[in-house]
Regions:
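Class I SAM-dependent methyltransferase SAM/SAH-binding core
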Residues: 52-94
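A short glycine-rich, Lys/Arg-flanked "PGG" loop and its adjoining helix->strand segment in the class I
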Residues: 121-133
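A short acidic, Gly/Pro-enriched loop at the edge of an enzyme's catalytic core
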Residues: 96-103
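Core SAM-dependent methyltransferase catalytic element
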Residues: 221-237
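Conserved S-adenosyl-L-methionine
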Residues: 190-194, 211-220
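SAM-dependent methyltransferase
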Residues: 138-204
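Conserved class I S-adenosyl-L-methionine
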Residues: 1-48
Length: 237
């Protein structure tokens, strides 16, 4: 899997992930301020961090953050963008640390890119180990019931565009993604996601000692309604 994302790193930031990561971060901080005004959330671990945009946002807002991703090329881009943030290349289901964290994030439907359900369960178990008591796991899921499976063209600016189309392969959804500059095809690949429901994910997290604290399509005024924004709380040890 890391080979695919090493290749994806070439165009990852061109696909609009930066904008969504910033919106997710802003909505998340509003949530913490309003729902947990008396708690400290100053240590973050961002798993499946990609090119590190969310980590950069956290640092700019006074939060100590670290990013982990299985793709070495993604981590290289993250390190070049944010040289003063620690990034680690590692399978997030196996990552270990001497520290625990106030909250762990996994944005832009990154958990669904772990396409083996057993690996998803291992990742959740590991998140539990890495969180402090009463810490939060904050993530999002694609709601494929609201996403078109028709071929789509997305203009990024006057010269750059994406063409992508989805189809189902058993429990997976495949994105065929093409990236063009000046009508020249520069990158094409298939990206797979696990089609998992909120109920299914919540059951897995309940099994590891989490409770669902919030489930929203808007996440405090950030209106990417095709994704579920989810907050799970680790129960006190």
């Amino acid at each position: 899997m890391h080979d695919l994302y090493d290749d994806f790193a070439k165009v990852y930031d061109e696909c609009g992930v930066d904008d969504y990561s910033l919106s997710f971060g802003k909505g998340m901080l509003k949530y913490l301020d309003l729902i947990h005004p008396d708690e400290s959330f100053k240590k973050n671990l961002d798993i499946c961090c990609g090119t590190g945009t969310l980590c950069g946002f956290f640092k700019d807002n006074g939060i100590k953050t670290k990013g982990v991703d299985i793709s070495n090329e993604m981590i290289k881009v993250a390190q070049s963008k944010y040289p003063d943030i620690e990034f680690v290349t590692c399978d997030v289901s196996k990552y270990s640390d001497d520290e625990t964290y106030d909250f762990i994030t996994c944005s832009d439907d990154a958990l669904q890119h772990i396409t083996n359900i057993d690996d998803t369960k291992k990742t959740i178990k590991n998140v539990n180990k890495l969180l402090r008591p009463n810490g939060l796991f904050i993530l999002d899921l694609n709601n494929f019931n609201l996403i078109s499976f028709e071929k789509r063209n997305k203009s990024l600016d006057e010269t750059r565009r994406l063409v992508y189309q989805l189809h189902r392969e058993n429990e997976l959804v495949c994105y065929n993604v093409k990236y063009y500059e000046n009508d020249e095809l520069l990158w094409e690949n298939n990206v797979f996601e696990l089609d998992i429901s909120v109920d299914e994910l919540t059951q897995m997290l309940n099994d590891e000692g989490f409770i669902l604290e919030s489930c929203s399509q808007h996440f405090f005024f950030e209106k990417q309604i095709k994704k579920w924004k989810l907050v799970y709380k680790k129960t006190d040890d």
